[in-house]
From Swiss-Prot:
Role of this protein: Catalyzes the oxidative ring opening of 3-hydroxyanthranilate to 2-amino-3-carboxymuconate semialdehyde, which spontaneously cyclizes to quinolinate.
Keyword Lipid metabolism (UniProt): no
Source species of the chain: Lodderomyces elongisporus (strain ATCC 11503 / CBS 2605 / JCM 1781 / NBRC 1676 / NRRL YB-4239)
Sites where the protein binds O2: R45
GO MF terms, alphabetically ordered: 3-hydroxyanthranilate 3,4-dioxygenase activity; ferrous iron binding
Binding residues annotated for Fe cation, in chain numbering: H49, E55, H93
Cellular component aspect of the GO annotation: cytoplasm
Descriptive protein name: 3-hydroxyanthranilate 3,4-dioxygenase
Gene symbol of the encoding locus: BNA1
Annotated localization: Cytoplasm
Binding residue positions for a divalent metal cation: C122, C125, C159, C162
Phylogenetic placement of the source organism: Eukaryota, Fungi, Dikarya, Ascomycota, Saccharomycotina
Catalytic activity: 3-hydroxyanthranilate + O2 = (2Z,4Z)-2-amino-3-carboxymuconate 6-semialdehyde
Cofactor(s) of this protein: Fe(2+)
Amino acid sequence: MPLPEPLNIKAWVEENEHLLKPPVNNFCLHRGGFTVMIVGGPNERSDYHINQTPEYFYQYKGTMCLKVVDEGKFRDIYIREGDTFLLPPNVPHNPCRFENTVGIVVEQDRPKGVNDRIRWYCARCESIVCEEEFYLTDLGTQIKDAIVAFDSNIEAKTCKNCGHVNSSKREPAEF
């Protein structure tokens, strides 16, 4: 099989930006060994993803905020247009994408036996509310399925520490 031609990101985004809107917000450009996604904004997710492999971010258009838990403390990392960032393994993170932004994310395929986690923290007291662990084979469906399951389960959404009922959605981020 001959090698594919290079992809012009600018032209692709101009032709396909409609694919980068809610509810999906992303398009997989490549699968096999690693996944390359183009991701648009805005998004509303409140969950934190934890994977045991690094995750690479390149911000093509606009600014995004990568919410992380860094050594037990919540912190925001702003990745501006033209910036790149390599997130180390096992860092809880929530990529907040603003309106009219486009980024590229690269994730390594998970080795057998290496599970991902999706975690929700309480919006009021920051305690862990719920955490699900799974072997990730399809970024496009499995995280969405976990979010839908969380949002439909009042017990999973209720903080055991303070009683606050949380949501899978947050207010759309603005910069």
